[in-house]
């Protein structure tokens, strides 16, 4: 079904690109997810690369409408690149995703901060895997700060995200030789996890 939709959109884009390019990009991004779940990593990568190309051109024409889609598609590109073993290109893709998410959140925090925080957390992990200690530490701090801001407004939605970001931050601090800071941050994360477990237990009665 996805292939049929893409074939139709390709024909429409060839004859009248303006109203149909976004539909083709969206269909390719959906196909990427389906191929990835099916273990067809190289086909998924080809599909998402094409989708990113379309979203880049759309975002140049209408940034407000399509930069969020470009960021989401770049995130999928990073995942696909990692799946085929290209960690360097995956890191570049997630860096670009984070740069776009930062820009969007700066302009409209209420709308875009919920996507920025987990993006920064993922970038922290990628940077750590690549051995970029200083940058991973800086990004971990940024991720925690983004989650703290979200938790102040919606603790039930973002509390566990903050706990996870704190765990990662503690690991990076430990890697950087900041043992005391790492212990303090890890303790905060554990306390949040215990509070959530107690809350869930109470609700279960």
Across the structure, where does each feature detected by a protein language model lie?
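Boundary/linker segments of alpha-helical solenoid repeat arrays
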Residues: 13, 59, 104-106, 150-152, ...
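Residue register of alpha-helical TPR repeats
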Residues: 19, 23-26, 46, 65, ...
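Conserved alpha-helical positions within TPR/SEL1-like repeat arrays
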Residues: 22-37, 68-83, 114-129, 160-171
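Terminal, low-structured helical/coil segments at or just beyond the last alpha-helical repeat
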Residues: 175, 179-205
């Amino acid at each position: 079904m996805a292939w049929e939709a893409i074939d139709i959109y390709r024909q429409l884009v060839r004859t009248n690109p303006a109203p149909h390019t976004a539909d083709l990009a969206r269909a390719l991004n959906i196909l990427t997810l389906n191929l990835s779940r099916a273990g067809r990593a190289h086909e998924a990568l080809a599909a998402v690369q094409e989708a990113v190309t379309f979203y880049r051109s759309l975002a140049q024409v209408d940034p407000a409408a399509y930069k969020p889609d470009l960021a989401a598609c770049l995130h999928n590109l990073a995942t696909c690149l990692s799946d085929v073993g290209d960690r360097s290109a995956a890191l570049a893709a997630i860096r670009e995703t984070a740069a776009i998410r930062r820009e969007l959140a700066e302009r409209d925090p209420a709308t875009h901060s919920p996507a920025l925080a987990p993006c920064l957390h993922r970038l922290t992990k990628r940077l750590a895997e690549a051995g970029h200690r200083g940058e991973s530490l800086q990004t971990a701090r940024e991720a925690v700060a983004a989650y703290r801001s979200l938790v102040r407004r919606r603790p039930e939605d973002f509390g566990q995200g903050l706990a996870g970001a704190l765990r990662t931050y503690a690991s990076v601090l430990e890697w950087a030789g900041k043992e005391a800071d790492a212990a303090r941050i890890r303790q905060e994360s554990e306390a949040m996890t215990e509070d959530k477990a107690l809350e869930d237990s109470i609700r279960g009665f």
